[in-house]
């Protein structure tokens, strides 16, 4: 029994919570994603990519940043699994990954800054 191994007995049972607690690796994955979103420009780029698929050049103009800076943010977001890319000839297009994780982060960003998605206001 886990309770018998705790330093203090406060009359509560935590066996259930400990049994279903995510692994240390899962918490580290979440921490790594939060690190990726610790930059305001990166959050803005991710938010835009949740609403459109764009190339580096166009997105650079949209956020008024250099192409190398946007490419750096793309690399970080891609390594976190939040965006994906596809090649069409010489052009590479980026968009938010179609994953529960990316959708949840998108909604979290919107909730935290209290803005409405263009697609949600049209419905």
Whereabouts are the PLM-identified features?
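Residues within the DNA-recognition helix of helix-turn-helix
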Residues: 73
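N-terminal helix-turn-helix DNA-binding core of bacterial DNA-binding proteins
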Residues: 24-66, 92-101
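Amphipathic alpha-helical dimerization/coiled-coil segments
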Residues: 2-29, 97-123
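Solvent-exposed, charged/polar functional surfaces in cytosolic regulatory/catalytic domains
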Residues: 40, 77, 111, 115
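Beta-hairpin "wing" of winged helix-turn-helix
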Residues: 78-88, 95
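A generic structural-conservation signal
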Residues: 58, 86-87, 121
